[in-house]
Amino acid sequence: MGFNCGIVGLPNVVKSTLFNALTSTAAAEAANYPFCTIEPNKGRVAVPDERLLEISKLANSEKVIGAQLEFVDIAGLVKGASKGEGLGNQFLANIRETDAIIHVLRCFEDDNISHVEESIQPIRDIEIIETELLLSDLESINRQMLNLEKKARSGDKEIKKQLEVVKKIASKLEEGTPIRKYTDWDAQDEELLKNSNMLTSKPLVYVCNVEEESAAIGNALSKEVETYAKADGSGCVIVSAAIEAEISQLTYQEEKNEFLTTLGLEEAGLNKLIRAGYGLLNLITFFTAGPKEARAWTLPKDSTAPQGAGKIHSDFELSLIHISEPTRPL
């Protein structure tokens, strides 16, 4: 499993501003007009983890290396994207290459910033993107179904089983049900789903981009999204892109902390977003530490201790004999 999250949304919802703040770069053009991003921009960020800092102090480590997560800034989708509107097919293909989806929503009013739908309604915006992902998946699964139907004429039992699963997927998509909401799959179904790479099977979190004054507790629009996300079984994070852009310009952590304190914020919204992305990918962390460095390592959840050892060095996976738990909680 890869470790990357695609940042998606309608055009001009400040995705690129968030991406630039996340990666502390200006790699993605951010402008007040749709489709200022065409090609996806990629950047890696460290996952904030207080445990690693504590361990580095205990080990007197010279260097601290955090777990890394890749974010991909993908151009905005519009109605009809699944039919090619606004270069939609290209952008949907970019999303298909990611492991999880971070859906950025505009949750603030500002007459100086245009909205492609000409009004601020985040739930409507969610439904627009969801519809395009569903339609793209349905087109993809129908192609797979036609291909399997031809092969099934040979009487191959395995092909027939695959065809049954594909038909089940298609029926859910036709009902308007994202695949991630449907859990009645057996192990073989899960494997086929994984290989099918459905957009709506990817884990998802909503990011509510609010005005500066609402960064601490959100606003009426973000609360609508929080309610929707809870019913949807998805996560929700409140962020002010304007604040995050300012923080990214500060050099020292002390300056950042002081700035956050003046705004009544305990931490940067992007830290919450990074952790949410990490959680979406179903990852776990383990640590190594010594005088030279303290490092966080990343593994898929339910990995074994030998697999973890193999991340450090391939020989360790073959020769690991024993592992003990820490004597103090982290």
Where are these regions (language model features)?
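Active-site phosphate-binding and catalytic loops of NTP-dependent enzymes
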Residues: 26-33, 57, 155, 175-185, ...
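Conserved C-terminal guanine-recognition region of P-loop GTPase G domains, centered on the G4
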Residues: 88-238, 243-244
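Canonical P-loop GTPase G-domain recognition
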Residues: 213-287
